[in-house]
Amino acid sequence: MGKKKGSGAGAYLLLALSVVFVAACGAVFWLASTGRLSSLLSGHGVEGSVESPASEDLAVKTFSDYSWDELSEIARRISAAPDDQSGLEVARRFGIVGDDGEISDCVRAVQLSDGRVATCRVVGVRADDLADGSGKAGLTFMISSLAQRPMNDAATNVGGWGSSSLRSWLEAEGMALLPSDLAASIKPVSKLTNNSGVVTDGFDIVSSTTDNLWLFSASEVFGGLSWFAHEFGTKPIPNTVYTDFAPYDRLISSEGPQYAYFSDHGVADLCGYEVLPGALGQVDGNWWMRTPYPVSFVGIDESCFYQVMASGYPSTVLSSDQENGVVAGFCL
């Protein structure tokens, strides 16, 4: 019987096709297992499917080891949370809030552009309203001390914080003191203040400003206040012209709620202020608050803003043309 021609070539062809098929199946399996197949099918190609470092989850670190870019991303996630409790859970995951729900001792040094080193700490989580109305800023910080500056060039509190020269200084020179990566990450927020100054009637005068760097108000640090009741009492004194000072206490208590860091540490009205010097690091003496002193006695005090003493004691005032410490707040 004669030999069949071509049978060897057919076998080799079949073997080659089998090898190609197996290799193709292996390639498809590898693409699917690495996520590259879906990218190819969607038209993005293999390069578009490779995860970039920015898309990977952030590692939990000691607070001072986070970069400002990382803290900005953590703050963004806190801000994007559907509610405050979810935001606190994000903060807890990254070590900013403890298991007890209180703000941890999140403090770090900040190298300023003039060579000095400031102390910075977290004082609030989802506490401030973003100025664009999109929700809450993720984190609020306190930084001290940026400078020794007067509140105004002249001795006046007319126009309050909103019209002060120190506010303008913080927006320009103050921001320039900060590291560039920090300054670029700061989110402008809305701050409530008596932006009139001295008030004689019509106490519903608190208004909003948009700020990147700002001074703390009396109520943001010390909570609900009774400073006028403490100084002047609540009952008429015989043979004197009696002034009801209760509206003034309500006014200075309405410039924003107290930040959690201060309430967590027992700061309240005229109590618990001893923790402030340790919280702020090195501060040269007293420091400004943005709250104007709203009462004028024969014109003597229409130039004053509240200040915090080096001991942490509040409720004292200083003429606005005098230099004082600049302890500022900002948000990410």
Regions found by a protein language model. Give the residues of each.
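Collagenous Gly-X-Y triple-helix signature in extracellular proteins
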Residues: L40, G45-L332
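Gram-positive cell-envelope targeting signals
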Residues: M1-S55
